[in-house]
């Protein structure tokens, strides 16, 4: 059994129930002091694989090589996933195509990261106050041009952990799937 198939089925159920968190994940990396750090990102289904779009100016871009984890929780179906994965850079053609479909504000932010300040940089108080105005005034280049720092990652999971919460007297159900020599090995776990 491929746990990615189960993941997508559970996610589809959450979407059917209009769960606002169905497309979100917490993308977890390690900072320089080995502290875990997480940020909520949109988790995408890219041709049956997991992917995220991020900006190369983000600290996450450099931290990804130390390994990443994802966590999702969908309250509508009471299911949590923890996923460990390695990453591969998404095809730049896919980035170009997808980037053009983004709303204007995220596009402007990508250009802001490219031309003004990188993502996660500290702002002086005056800069913070004027950020919304500065973004509004930012003129986007020709639509065929995509910032060099716009990027994405294809996630290559090697471990899934699924927790199904259960009400009443039933214990929660917890399973782990580990990729071993190209095959998924299943383990039932104590919840």
Predicted regions and their residues:
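A short, aromatic/hydrophobic, helix- or strand-capping loop or linear motif
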Residues: 18, 73-74, 112
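An N-terminal domain-cap segment
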Residues: 1-47, 51, 55, 62-64
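Residues that cap or initiate secondary-structure elements
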Residues: 33, 58, 76-78, 91, ...
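Tryptophan-centered motif/residue detector
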Residues: 10, 72-74, 184
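Short, surface-exposed beta-edge/turn micro-motifs
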Residues: 22-24, 48-50, 66-68, 149-152, ...
């Amino acid at each position: 059994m491929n746990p990615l198939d189960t993941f997508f089925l559970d996610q589809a159920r959450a979407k059917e129930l209009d769960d606002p968190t169905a497309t979100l994940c917490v993308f977890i990396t390690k900072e320089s002091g080995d502290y875990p750090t997480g940020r909520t990102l949109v988790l995408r289904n890219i041709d049956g694989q997991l992917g995220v779009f991020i900006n190369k100016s983000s600290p996450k871009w450099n931290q990804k090589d130390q390994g990443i984890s994802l966590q999702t929780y969908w309250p509508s179906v009471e299911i949590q996933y923890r996923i460990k994965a390695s990453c591969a850079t998404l095809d730049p053609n896919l980035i170009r195509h997808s980037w053009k479909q983004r709303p204007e504000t995220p596009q402007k932010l990508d250009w802001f990261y490219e031309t003004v300040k990188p993502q996660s940089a500290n702002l002086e108080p005056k800069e913070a106050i004027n950020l919304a105005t500065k973004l509004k005034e930012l003129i986007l280049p020709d639509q065929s041009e995509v910032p060099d720092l716009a990027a994405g990652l294809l996630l290559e999971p090697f471990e899934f952990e699924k927790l199904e919460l259960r009400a009443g007297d039933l214990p929660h159900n917890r399973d782990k799937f580990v990729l071993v020599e190209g095959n998924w090995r299943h383990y039932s776990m104590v919840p």
